[in-house]
Amino acid sequence: MADPEKILKVSVVTPDGIVYSHNATMVAMRAIDGERTIMYDHLPIVTPLAIGEVRVKRTHEMNDRVDHIAVNGGYIEFSNNEATIIADSAERARNIDVERAQSAKKRAEQHMQEAKEKHNEREMLEAEIALRRAVNRLHVRENYGK
């Protein structure tokens, strides 16, 4: 059993509402400057997140299960052993619709090709971001969605 004094409260919130909220012993994510892991009593931090996977190691009562969440930007704020991730969008691995993610990937690839042909850098950047989001969702679902 996890020491109740060493538990974090982890929440992931999007403009659509709460996507995830559980007690945990660790949360790891990709910040814009690299991988970050937060455990009990970590110093307070606010940092922007990159498109990537968030891993939450649940408490021993949950057999140390690790939950995986696809996060598309945002930031994490941690203080007083509460981690709140405010994300542009986020989905738990088990909730990701593979067909939708594959369609988004295909659309992004088409937009990239069109932007390349038009030599439009802004559209190319937007398409690259959309592609990274779709690939992230597919990766999280295919590797961790049960």
Curated annotation (Swiss-Prot):
InterPro entries attached to this UniProt entry: ATP_F1_dsu/esu_C_sf (IPR036794), ATP_synth_F1_dsu/esu (IPR001469), ATP_synth_F1_dsu/esu_N (IPR020546), ATP_synth_F1_esu_C (IPR020547), ATPsynth_dsu/esu_N (IPR036771)
Primary location class: membrane
A single cellular component GO annotation: plasma membrane
Residues covered by region (Disordered): 102-122
Entry annotated with the keyword Cell membrane: yes
Function description: Produces ATP from ADP in the presence of a proton gradient across the membrane.
Domain of life: Bacteria
Family the entry assigns: Belongs to the ATPase epsilon chain family.
Organism: Lactobacillus gasseri (strain ATCC 33323 / DSM 20243 / BCRC 14619 / CIP 102991 / JCM 1131 / KCTC 3163 / NCIMB 11718 / NCTC 13722 / AM63)
Location in the cell: Cell membrane
Statement: the UniProt record of this protein carries the keyword Membrane: yes
Topology of the protein relative to the lipid bilayer: Peripheral membrane protein
Gene3D superfamilies per the UniProt record, alphabetical: ATP synthase delta/epsilon subunit, C-terminal domain, F0F1 ATP synthase delta/epsilon subunit, N-terminal
GO molecular-function terms, A-Z: ATP binding; proton-transporting ATP synthase activity, rotational mechanism
Sorted UniProt keywords: ATP synthesis, Cell membrane, CF(1), Hydrogen ion transport, Ion transport, Membrane, Transport
Subunit details: F-type ATPases have 2 components, CF(1) - the catalytic core - and CF(0) - the membrane proton channel. CF(1) has five subunits: alpha(3), beta(3), gamma(1), delta(1), epsilon(1). CF(0) has three main subunits: a, b and c.
UniProt lineage: Bacteria, Bacillati, Bacillota, Bacilli, Lactobacillales
Full protein name: ATP synthase epsilon chain
